[in-house]
Amino acid sequence: MGPDNRRILLATVLSVGILILWQVIFPTKKAPPKPAHPPAAEVAKPAAPASPAPGAAAPAVPAPPPDAPEETVTLAGKGFEATLTTYGGALKSLRLEGDKFRKQEKDREVQIDLVHVTSGQPYPLSLSASPELGGAVDVAADPGARAPMRIVANDASSVTFEGRVGNLAARKTFRVTGKPYELALDVELSGGAGSGTVGVLYPAFMPPDTKSGGIFSGPPLDFVRPVCRAGTTTERFDLAKEGAPEKLEGQVSWAGVDQHYFVAAVLPAEPIGTCTFVRGPVKGAGLAAVAVPVEGGARKLSLTVYAGPKDLDTLRGYGRGFESAIDYGAVAKFFALFARGLLYVMRWLEAIVRNWGVAIILLTVLVRLVLFPLTYKSMQSMNEMRKLQPEIEKLKAKFGDDREKMNLAVMQLYQKHKVNPLGGCLPMLLQMPVWFALYAALQTSVELYREPFLWMKDLTAHDPYFILPIAMGISSFVMQKLSPQPADNAQAKMMLYFFPGFFTVIMLFVPGGLTLYIFVNNLLSIVQQQLMMKHQQAAPAPAAGK
């Protein structure tokens, strides 16, 4: 590899490395979208009287007393356990079942709960009426959304609540459908007066100091954001920001809360209403409100609730762009298609070997086989350059500190012996898209979450003992030792020592699955290089240029 080309490669790798470190240390903060003030009828119009207009039918369901004690009902579904509360007739908790869906909380492991609310917030799937229907001005702190409801029917697979939403009588029935991570919700509104909207609320809370991650650094497991699919666009709402409500254009296909490898969302039978992100009542709290039109004081809704892992095939099965709940991030999004391809290959391999770590190792071997013709030619070029090292040493002695003349002479030597100095760059450049795609898969694919390999408990997290990054750094050093060294001694030392050390630092906190891939790839490169060197030892060195 020529000196200039080595500098180009080194500059490229260092630039990527510095960008990775910068994003890990200083995560990118997404700028808030331009506020879109929703119509006054939906959010900010002064409240209308709660009593029905003259001549309107009286409500069929009396409101429970405001100080009614809370009652809860638990429904066991396929892969989850949902607890529903009489406060708003809503979802109080939804815990995923199984050892895979656990997280560390202080000194113990607990099941992952997909409900994240704080004091003063409504619960997920509660309802809030617009002022025209007797509701509050501020939907994020609407006390009516937490108003007590009555349990009027309950069995092992369903529960029905009755109560009031503004001046409407409301009946809500939750049913376990038998599908993984799915509930059905039927809503019947009646007995009101006038027209307005009723919001189906999906709130979330996250401590304001929670880091969001950066382009190359994934968010923590408990990083949550309200999310909505309106029209053909999926938008996420930054809870750390402050500002006015943000209304999305287009009818709503689904809305809910995004939690890294998981999503909890409500999906109407067909696109309806509008979606508005509303902040409050405290910092770090907010919600997605799906405003559904109610004409003549009555409306029926049939909703599907999915709360579970972001399995690509499962989300695609719902249609409505639900697979866009998987957020590949800014840079990783560019490699999303490639990442999905790698995931399908790894799933196929894991089905055979029953271990995701071994599947990553086999993926590394497969990629090496696919790229073998190109890497073989590249290593041939590197070996030819190695044979020219004695001639390069003579040129260094001849030209001394005159780097310009020495570099020109080296390039002429390469041209004379038809050696491509760029050949040594090829293996790394070809692998870089695979690295980024694998990183995207590790950061977004729930299949790999909490999957162990050897001493690592989770391939999506960094190696807790830093064994793999150090081993990867050592293998990078060996690879550099086997590579032809630049004519420039200072540059040779940088390539030999600084590059492996810097690369090791970069890899300390990236997912262990990616470090495993690069380490195994380095080992295969070393073995291939050694075999080729042994095979070509008997070949005569090219004649020296004169």
UniProtKB/Swiss-Prot annotation:
Subcellular location per UniProt equals: Cell inner membrane
InterPro entries, alphabetized? Membr_insert_YidC (IPR019998), Membr_insert_YidC_N (IPR028053), YidC/ALB3/OXA1/COX18 (IPR001708), YidC/Oxa/ALB_C (IPR028055), YidC_ALB_C (IPR047196), YidC_periplasmic_sf (IPR038221)
In which domain of life is the source organism classified? Bacteria
Positions of disulphide bridges: none
Region of interest (Disordered), ranges: 31-70
The UniProt record lists the keyword Cell cycle: no
Enumerate the UniProt keywords alphabetically. Answer: Cell inner membrane, Cell membrane, Chaperone, Membrane, Protein transport, Transmembrane, Transmembrane helix, Transport
Write out the GO MF terms. Answer: membrane insertase activity
Q: Tell me, what is an example of a GO biological process annotation in this record?
A: protein insertion into membrane
GO cellular component, alphabetical, reads: plasma membrane
Query: Where does the sequence pass through the membrane?
Result: 8-28, 326-346, 356-376, 422-442, 459-479, 498-518
Please verify whether the record's keywords include Translocase: no
- Report any Pfam family annotated for this entry: YidC_periplas
Membrane topology reported for the UniProt record: Multi-pass membrane protein
Location (main, coarse): membrane
- What spans are recorded as compositionally biased (Low complexity)? 39-60
Query: NCBIfam families this protein is in?
Result: yidC_nterm, yidC_oxa1_cterm
Q: How does it assemble?
A: Interacts with the Sec translocase complex via SecD. Specifically interacts with transmembrane segments of nascent integral membrane proteins during membrane integration.
The entry sums up its family as follows: Belongs to the OXA1/ALB3/YidC family. Type 1 subfamily.
Q: What does this protein do?
A: Required for the insertion and/or proper folding and/or complex formation of integral membrane proteins into the membrane. Involved in integration of membrane proteins that insert both dependently and independently of the Sec translocase complex, as well as at least some lipoproteins. Aids folding of multispanning membrane proteins.
By what name is this protein known?
Membrane protein insertase YidC
Q: Which organism is it from?
A: Anaeromyxobacter dehalogenans (strain 2CP-1 / ATCC BAA-258)
